Amino acid sequence: MTFVIADRYELDAVIGSGGMSEVFAATDTLIGREVAVKMLRIDLAKDPNFRERFRREAQNSGRLSHSSIVAVFDTGEVDKDGTSVPYIVMERVQGRNLREVVTEDGVFTPVEAANILIPVCEALQASHDAGIIHRDVKPANIMITNTGGVKVMDFGIARAVNDSTSAMTQTSAVIGTAQYLSPEQARGKPADARSDIYATGCVMYELVTGKPPFEGESPFAVAYQHVQEDPTPPSDFIADLTPTSAVNVDAVVLTAMAKHPADRYQTASEMAADLGRLSRNAVSHAARAHVETEETPEEPETRFSTRTSTQVAPAAGVAAASTGSGSSSRKRGSRGLTALAIVLSLGVVGVAGAFTYDYFANSSSTATSAIPNVEGLPQQEALTELQAAGFVVNIVEEASADVAEGLVIRANPSVGSEIRQGATVTITVSTGREMINIPDVSGMTLEDAARALEDVGLILNQNVREETSDDVESGLVIDQNPEAGQEVVVGSSVSLTMSSGTESIRVPNLTGMNWSQAEQNLISMGFNPTASYLDSSEPEGEVLSVSSQGTELPKGSSITVEVSNGMLIQAPDLARMSTEQAISALRAAGWTAPDQSLIVGDPIHTAALVDQNKIGFQSPTPATLFRKDAQVQVRLFEFDLAALVQ
């Protein structure tokens, strides 16, 4: 049998389950959209703290809007077997998660893994910018869609598990998570954005090797290794790597997995940038910084960008700047990278020379330089950096909601690219936020409103509310926030409230109530009542029945109320009474007709002299209900000798 929640989401088959929830395929019947509905396990839903955390984290997830994040459309609670169970309505993604892909298709090459994890890092950066730490980055929470897209799931939901019970005491919920747990989380310390970066490094390790960096018989054993042990460099498990490629992939993975958060990439964007270099076989900043640190350990860093999250890539032959992860902390490095450094220092001519050959000597006749990282720099400073590196600079302008006016949004070719000196580099400089007036979408359908907002560069908030309305037809917009005409930044989100039509109200049972009171009650409820008076023996003005009683009708509906006029009385038994006695008996019963309305008909012949002029027939008959203003017909006995003879 079909199960519908919130009068909107029609649930179908279970498409996934985990230690804390079940996920159903579902349809949003309001707008005809396929969705997924995640429900908390009923035993966990009985914990008020757990339920509240789940609800709040779902709301946090709903704040995120990114193409690589599974969108959260709605949240709520539904009664199941007497327990209020929280649920989350999400975008339904058609595809497989990374764990399934690796199991079924095998490992990724480092370049393939980098291309998968770049959008993951971008999604994490969007989450971190919104103040949300994922806390449960793992292959099972990363989907590859049927069209090749990447979607990150379950933002913030793991926090509910951690708040309810220790991650290390609920084995069934953590065995998958423990393999991607950062050292600080394993020690019970708070997680931050760099904890997600550590987990992403663990995911990349698994993608390129086919196994997690640490394995053990229990979550405790795995967590211990995260804190105390260095992982085997992933290149040890990857065949057919050149020395430079091996160092490159090891540097990226092991930098992300550094034991101390200060030694990791400091932002997901920084890791995404290095993954981008890895994906195009350019030397990563992690590898470059490590080679230089080990080859010239006493040399100070030479130059820093004004942004601390990225390194300024120098021209060929010039010492590189430290990454924004911090100078002294990055020099500490993880022991895994120290091992790499030993290899590099022992084989300066071989491996380090290979870097020089592979990346800095692409042309025997033309000098090249790496494009320095000018993203986020003021225009003039970026111009100076690029000209000092030997490039011709072309400047274009573009509005941006994220980059302040006058700062560089991006470079083309991209930062870190090795190109010949004297080539042209185009930098795009922000003109600030582009503002636009919000269009009026009131009275539109949801589809038309979404299209109107999209046409001007605005985004429809997927959490669409519904309200009843006496004035606006069901399915049309009745309110928008921000209001129409307000000036906002292009790319802003607009929330809509849709009409569900006129409010429906249950018609009450008013039988036996006085009509005047019943009328007031119905009017106060929003109905338009009309009385229909019927002949009845009930007291005058008493309600006999109400049309559509017990059903729900739209507010403003007309209601017919049947009301007693009190005109029916019960006919008394007039047998063998005189007409005078009959009139008295009728009056006592409530008869209001004039005395002349007692109609005496043809006599009834009788041989009993005692019955002379007594009533022998009446209409209506005794106990019959009749109108109290109606005529009463009687026939009197008349003594007849002939009847005696007969």
UniProtKB/Swiss-Prot annotation:
Lineage: Bacteria, Bacillati, Actinomycetota, Actinomycetes, Mycobacteriales
GO MF annotation: an example: ATP binding
Keyword Repeat part of the UniProt annotation: yes
List of catalytic residues: D136 (proton acceptor)
Classification via Pfam families: PASTA (PF03793), Pkinase (PF00069)
EC number(s) from the headed UniProt entry: 2.7.11.1
Ranges where the Protein kinase domain occurs: 9-278
Residues involved in ATP binding: I15, G16, S17, G18, G19, M20, S21, E22, V23, K38
Transferase as UniProt keyword: yes
Signal sequence coordinates: none
EC class name: transferase
Annotated segments matching region Disordered: 283-332
Domain PASTA: 365-431, 432-500, 501-565, 570-638
PROSITE patterns recorded: PASTA, PROTEIN_KINASE_ATP, PROTEIN_KINASE_DOM, PROTEIN_KINASE_ST
Keywords: ATP-binding, Kinase, Nucleotide-binding, Repeat, Serine/threonine-protein kinase, Transferase
Catalysed reactions listed for this entry: L-seryl-[protein] + ATP = O-phospho-L-seryl-[protein] + ADP + H(+); L-threonyl-[protein] + ATP = O-phospho-L-threonyl-[protein] + ADP + H(+)
Biased amino acid composition, Low complexity: 303-328
SUPFAM superfamilies from the UniProt entry: Protein kinase-like (PK-like) (SSF56112)
Homology family: Belongs to the protein kinase superfamily. Ser/Thr protein kinase family.
Protein name per its UniProtKB record: Probable serine/threonine-protein kinase PknB
InterPro entries xref list: Kinase-like_dom_sf, PASTA_dom, Prot_kinase_dom, Protein_kinase_ATP_BS, Ser/Thr_kinase_AS
